[in-house]
């Protein structure tokens, strides 16, 4: 099947059809054919013009193949968060854990394909902020609100990777230095790796990150299966046991927290428009997306289930590296995670930096050429982002719980609500207010599906935020909240 037909079912064979020829009074299928051909032509023309404008630039942005884009996606999704899936399964039970992992993966794939279709229709879109503006009445206010959420989301992910970098260094060195120093070191190293100006330039690092992470989780899974006992094994507790379904005393907050943990690992659609905007052939993005999603579902499910079965409810930690009984096993498997500890923060820093940089230097020679002003500004923006990320990570004593709140609020929009609305927006533009009738059975099914997607987003925004806030309250009550700018050990076995 032609890729444009995947994006726009019923693609017309006449490439010269334009929007003016699309008569709403035509039969639905013929009308859709006229429209899809028009959008396909518009995409080709716009991308061609963008590539042509870069012909004499020394820095070319539309250079990513679908393979390089797949590497970026693999590095974004195949990450440390995988090692928290065993904990989620221990809370939810094996059967619900597997079902929810597969279900969330499929829903995120569907919404990501909606993003792809939207970007093909409107190839001038550069990032999620442009989409937000277009979806909600072309409002500049919505653009600014989306930009604030976009930058906060990305910066908080950078902050998280400052902390997990410090966690790794503390674990390996037995807390040989102040945690603040370790997290600052992580920020400094990440700044250096953030310097490439294009996603194509980052793709090799992304490939290394994804491969190393896969090795890390594979080793951890094998080690959990072959060692005699997990860490803190106690003969009085007995051997590890696992449950097919949640324990009877599992609370709503605990169960929802485990579900959110699974969902947050899948939700990464915020970067997709930025990736598509730098592809040579945006119509090939579905290949990258499908390959990564299949790998995600398989890896997340197997790692979560296998480690949970061998570690059990009694000895589970998050991340699951801490459950390995042999310290050497733990250090070896955790060490292969280093590239992703660095690169995932780098990727989000790069997405934020180009968002700012492009808007400052759009239409100038500094954007596409090696100029002192261009490079000084690029480095300055990145440095500012990493310094801010480090300060946030160290200044907020309940940062991890705050990240859950941010994830629930922002994930509701960037993971679900935006893309349900995007489907309705495109269908309304093509077929009018009764689009679901004109599209037949498919129209009704997709309408129900996308309304469900929006409702899931609202669930994240409401109960999801409540569960995250309640987690912060419980941490305070249990004395689990530390202090700001602390040197305290945050290693896995501190």
Feature locations, PLM:
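Short Gly/Pro-enriched loop/turn and capping motifs at secondary-structure junctions
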Residues: 397, 410
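Non-cytosolic membrane-interface motifs at loop->transmembrane helix junctions
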Residues: 405-409
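Intrinsically disordered, low-complexity regions flanking or connecting the multi-pass transmembrane cores
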Residues: 1-394, 404, 414-494
């Amino acid at each position: 099947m032609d890729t444009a037909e995947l994006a726009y079912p019923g693609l017309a064979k006449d490439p010269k059809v334009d929007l003016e020829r699309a008569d709403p009074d035509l039969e639905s299928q013929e009308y859709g054919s006229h429209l899809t051909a028009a959008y396909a032509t518009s995409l080709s023309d716009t991308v061609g013009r963008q590539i042509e404008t870069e012909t004499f630039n020394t820095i070319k942005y539309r250079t990513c193949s679908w393979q390089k884009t797949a590497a970026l996606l693999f590095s974004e999704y195949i990450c440390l968060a995988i090692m928290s899936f065993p904990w989620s399964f221990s809370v939810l039970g094996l059967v619900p854990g597997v079902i929810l992992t597969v279900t969330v993966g499929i829903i995120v794939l569907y919404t990501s394909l909606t993003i792809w279709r939207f970007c093909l229709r409107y190839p001038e879109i550069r990032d999620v902020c442009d989409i937000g503006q277009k979806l909600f009445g072309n409002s500049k206010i919505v653009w600014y609100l989306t930009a604030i959420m976009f930058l906060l989301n990305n910066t908080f992910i950078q902050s998280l990777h400052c902390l997990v970098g410090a966690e790794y260094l503390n674990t390996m060195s037995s807390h040989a230095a102040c945690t603040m120093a370790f997290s600052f070191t992580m920020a400094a190293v990440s700044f250096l790796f953030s310097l490439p100006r294009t996603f194509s330039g980052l793709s090799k690092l992304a490939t290394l990150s994804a491969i190393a992470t896969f090795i890390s989780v594979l080793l951890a899974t094998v080690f959990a299966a072959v060692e005699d006992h997990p860490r803190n094994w106690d003969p009085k507790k007995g051997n590890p046991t696992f449950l097919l379904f949640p324990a009877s005393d599992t609370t709503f907050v605990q169960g929802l927290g485990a579900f959110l943990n699974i969902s947050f690992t899948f939700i990464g659609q915020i970067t997709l428009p930025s990736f598509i905007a730098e592809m040579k052939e945006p119509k090939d993005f579905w290949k990258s997306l499908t390959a990564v999603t299949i790998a995600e579902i398989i890896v997340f499910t197997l790692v979560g289930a296998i480690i949970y079965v061998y570690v059990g409810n009694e000895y589970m930690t998050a991340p699951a590296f801490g459950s390995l009984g042999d310290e050497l096993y733990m250090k070896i498997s955790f060490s292969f995670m280093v590239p992703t500890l660095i690169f995932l923060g780098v990727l989000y820093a790069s997405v934020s930096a180009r968002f700012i940089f492009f808007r400052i230097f759009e239409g100038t020679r500094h954007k596409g050429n090696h100029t002192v002003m261009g490079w000084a500004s690029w480095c300055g923006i990145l440095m500012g982002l990493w310094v801010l990320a480090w300060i946030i990570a160290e200044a907020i004593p309940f940062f991890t719980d705050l990240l859950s709140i941010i994830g629930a609020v922002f994930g509701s929009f960037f993971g679900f609500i935006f893309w349900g609305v995007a489907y309705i927006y495109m269908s309304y533009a093509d077929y009018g207010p009764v689009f679901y009738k004109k599209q037949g059975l498919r129209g009704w099914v997709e309408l129900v599906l996308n309304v469900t997607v929006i409702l899931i987003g609202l669930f994240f925004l409401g109960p999801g935020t409540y569960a995250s806030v309640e987690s912060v309250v419980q941490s305070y009550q249990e004395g689990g909240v530390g202090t700001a700018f602390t040197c305290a050990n945050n290693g896995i076995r501190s």
